[in-house]
Amino acid sequence: MSLVQSLSALLFPQLNVCHLCGRALEHARLLCPDCERRARGCHLPPSQQAGYDLQQLGGTVSAFYYRGVPKQLVHLLKYQADTALAQWLGEHMAAVLARSSLANADAVIPVPLHAQRLQDRGYNQSLLLAQVLCSCTGLELISDALVRSRPTGTQVGRTRAERLQALRGAFAVSDPHRLSGKRILLVDDVLTTGATAIACAEALWWTGTISVSLVTACRAEKDA
């Protein structure tokens, strides 16, 4: 929860407030109309979805560019424990997935956190997004299929090559037989360089999966 939202909730406990700007809302919703409108301005159009192809993946789709309101929402979800925002982001991920060729996946797998990071944060934001996505689409969620076998530290500020090196061998599959012959859809919050998804895909390929694709809430712009 943001500072503005916390103050609004403290001063006006009977009101619903926008999770981003703290504006009082008449109805139970997560964002005010103005913040919703600004967020929609960052939607990733269908014509741009194919602009971030990764050879190791069957495809990628993202709901938003990683800027403006969507970027703020991801930060609130990830670092300020505003877990309610997973609902809003996950619904938009489900909508963009439904319009893509990746909607025929057999199973959804969230990108895992290392046990220590999970303990520190208290939740895995990718799992929260995956739960909403599966609720909207009816796809099967396999939440424990992947494990992060060693800590990799923050990837912020690292180059793509550095990320690939840091993440190589960082993921393992808990039960390979459960995934054999399935089309897997990975779920993560942000697609930046693709290093995390590639590392996950490399672990999953050994299980005999048919394909591994990725859906995220946001995608970094290549010139960002």
Located regions from the model:
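Glycine-rich phosphate/pyrophosphate-handling loop used in enzymes and phosphotransfer proteins
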Residues: 1-188, 192-224
